């Protein structure tokens, strides 16, 4: 992640930073978008719904590009078993991607720890940021090994567990609660290799939401039903037990 001009520009108000983030999103300049929202978060210490979503979208795209790149490079490294030169190049490139991914994830985790979680209120905001914390520790776990992996896996589990407890105060159809269940179930499937627990969690969230679908508010109907579809898609994928190597589960 290169140093963005946003971090170097002086005299930018919070309003300016939000405007820059929106422009950067439209231009698909997600590094600039993330830089703007990082600076906004550090200046304000608290985010409204709009700013919260801008931060989430920015970093999801920034880290998502590195996660995808890592998978491709790691796959190439595994295939180059009979070519030492190609394998070495792929290994060096993978390590570079891992460093970038670690830097981005730790940047987000620092924002959460220092600014966002201490100021999180009400319940939906607390769940949102705890889920985000679980997500970014999960992304670290995808590339970590040995003791480092054990540590970030536990931290991801702890954050998701705290988020799940806090989410009990939200309706079962709330998109943040559903998104948490979706990502937590992916954690069990991909990181813990516990397909039974993943399916149990996803099915419980889906069934509970279906039971209260008639109470779903119009403003969240689209988001909630989309996540419910992702839950169902993952359940179908996992239940079939025929996932091709390289397939990636849906998360929010």
Curated annotation (Swiss-Prot):
It comes from the Eukaryota. Transmembrane segments: none annotated. Coiled coil: none annotated. SUPFAM superfamilies: 14-3-3 protein. Belongs to the 14-3-3 family. This is 14-3-3 protein homolog 1. It comes from Schistosoma mansoni.
């Amino acid at each position: 992640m290169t140093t963005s001009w946003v971090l170097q520009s002086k005299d930018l108000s919070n309003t300016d930073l939000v405007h820059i983030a929106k422009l950067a999103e439209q231009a698909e300049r997600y590094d600039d978008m993330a830089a703007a929202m990082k600076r906004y978060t550090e200046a304000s210490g608290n985010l409204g719904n709009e700013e919260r979503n801008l931060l989430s979208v920015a970093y999801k795209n920034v880290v998502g590009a590195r996660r995808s790149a890592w998978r491709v490079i790691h796959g190439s490294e595994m295939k180059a078993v009979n070519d030492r030169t190609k394998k070495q190049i792929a290994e060096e490139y993978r390590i570079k991607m891992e460093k970038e991914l670690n830097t981005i994830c730790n940047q987000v985790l620092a924002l959460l720890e220092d600014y966002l979680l201490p100021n999180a209120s009400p319940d939906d905001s607390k769940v949102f940021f705890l889920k985000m914390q679980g997500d970014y520790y999960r992304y670290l776990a995808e590339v970590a090994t040995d003791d480092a992996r054990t540590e970030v896996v536990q931290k991801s589990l702890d954050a998701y567990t705290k988020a799940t407890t806090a989410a009990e105060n939200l309706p079962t159809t709330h998109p943040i609660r559903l998104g948490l269940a979706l990502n937590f179930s992916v954690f069990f499937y991909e990181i813990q290799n516990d397909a039974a627990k993943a399916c149990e969690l996803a099915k419980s969230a889906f069934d509970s939401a279906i039971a209260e679908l008639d109470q779903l508010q119009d403003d969240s109907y689209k988001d909630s039903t989309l996540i419910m579809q992702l839950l169902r898609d993952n359940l179908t994928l996992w239940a079939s037990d025929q996932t091709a190597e390289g397939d990636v589960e849906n998360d929010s």
